[in-house]
């Protein structure tokens, strides 16, 4: 993997900097590095493909070295270099694709394609010029079963979940009380509602709670907490739990009271925030517990009192909500996030070449399925293919 990264980095630099008119002295170190790559690769043969619709391709390396010059690089020099660069870029692209479409239930962190296994041999270590990629660093750590750490922006840590629970229900569905939520990606939105606006509740207050368990521990997380859940702020028709009927939800938004968010790790509270909104942080956690209250307004103008009568029919439904959004965090496991396209790259390649469903990844690389059942085997394989996707993205956009 280190060698593949160094190949890609060298080729990217060569493609960007070996251009007509450039002073040789400005790129002499790069050309020496490029020639070392050629010396190491010359005389070797590789084969890629042969899975799904990915065609078999054979690769042979026998290239002349780039020479020295006292002046600027001329058109002939650049054309010779460009032909070599293009062949190598095509080779690296195919090695990456060949690796991204393979998976293994055992030791999935290790190279799975014949071509990358061969590049892992000792004779190619002379190509290992650069090991500065976060993905490469973490791949090396994971390969040695040491602690890794990925920094994510808006990590997709929450499997998609959209549902409701009813704490009070009637056959006519005209006087309900309960909780609705939508968890997806890096965001939780939860709303508590009471058709009667807590008219008969103790102290005219209803208590709500929403607990979300993460599939992986997050550390040093920056989080936004807002006293609103905009996705539940408009009328809708909701299917009943048994699917036999539907019920009408017509929210009128109130501000939540006594809001508390707890971040827990292995059942122990690590951080707690009460009535604090905006930006908060959490040290390390695997569970989030949100609790909040709906309090019937003690003093109401006639217009507000008309919204919340003391008896049925309840045409407007008192609702309070919270939004929790993980802006950034560190995780030992690789995740899809908002700042990278690794999941899309891997998924599109597997779809393009009609790769059959293997023993590890779900059909279509369904992220909700993958993160819901994030086994060690999936973690190893995902880190490997994401690392390869990051290498490929240096050359192929």
UniProtKB/Swiss-Prot annotation:
Chain positions recorded as Ca(2+) binding sites: 266, 286
Family per record: Belongs to the rotavirus VP6 family.
Tree of life domain: Viruses
GO terms for cellular component: viral envelope; viral intermediate capsid
Interaction with the inner capsid protein VP2, as annotated region: 62-73
Compartment(s): Virion
Name of the protein: Intermediate capsid protein VP6
Residues that bind Zn(2+): 153
Keyword Ubl conjugation set for record: yes
Subunit structure: Homotrimer. Interacts with the inner capsid protein VP2. Interacts with the outer capsid glycoprotein VP7. Interacts with the outer capsid protein VP5*.
GO biological process, one term: fusion of virus membrane with host plasma membrane
């Amino acid at each position: 993997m280190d060698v593949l990264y160094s190949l890609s980095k060298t080729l990217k630099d060569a493609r960007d900097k070996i251009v007509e008119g450039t002073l040789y002295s400005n790129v002499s170190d790069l050309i020496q590095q490029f020639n070392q790559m050629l010396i190491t690769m010359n005389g070797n043969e590789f084969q890629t493909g042969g899975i799904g619709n990915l065609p078999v391709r054979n690769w042979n390396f026998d290239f002349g070295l780039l020479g020295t010059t006292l002046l600027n690089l001329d058109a002939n020099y650049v054309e010779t270099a460009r032909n070599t660069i293009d062949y190598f870029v095509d080779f690296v692209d195919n090695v990456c694709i060949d690796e991204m479409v393979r998976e293994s239930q055992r030791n999935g962190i290790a190279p799975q394609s014949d071509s990358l296994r061969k590049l892992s041999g000792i004779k190619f270590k002379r190509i290992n010029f650069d090991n500065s990629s976060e993905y490469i660093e973490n791949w090396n750590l994971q390969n040695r079963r040491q602690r890794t750490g990925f920094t994510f922006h808006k990590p997709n840590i929450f499997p998609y979940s959209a549902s409701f629970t009813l704490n009070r229900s009637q056959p006519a569905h005209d006087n309900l009380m309960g909780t609705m939520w939508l968890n997806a990606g890096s965001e939780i939105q939860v709303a508590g509602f009471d058709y009667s606006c807590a008219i008969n509740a103790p102290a005219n207050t209803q208590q709500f709670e929403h607990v979300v368990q993460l599939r992986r521990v997050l550390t040093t997380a920056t989080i936004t907490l807002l006293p609103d859940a905009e996705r539940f702020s408009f009328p809708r028709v909701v299917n009943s739990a048994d699917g036999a009927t539907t019920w009408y939800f017509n929210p009128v938004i109130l501000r939540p009271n006594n809001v508390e968010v707890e971040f827990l790790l292995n059942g122990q509270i690590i951080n707690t925030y009460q009535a604090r909104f905006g930006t908060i942080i959490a040290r390390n956690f695997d569970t989030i517990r949100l609790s909040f209250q709906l309090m019937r307004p003690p003093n109401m103008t006639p217009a507000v009192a008309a919204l919340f009568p003391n008896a049925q029919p309840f045409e407007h439904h008192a609702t309070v909500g919270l939004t929790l959004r993980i802006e950034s965090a560190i995780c030992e496991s690789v995740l899809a996030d908002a700042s990278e396209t690794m999941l899309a790259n891997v998924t599109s390649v597997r779809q393009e070449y009609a790769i059959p469903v293997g023993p590890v990844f779900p059909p279509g690389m369904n992220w909700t399925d993958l993160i819901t059942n994030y086994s060690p085997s999936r973690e190893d394989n995902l880190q490997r293919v994401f690392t390869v996707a990051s290498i490929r993205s240096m050359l192929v956009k």
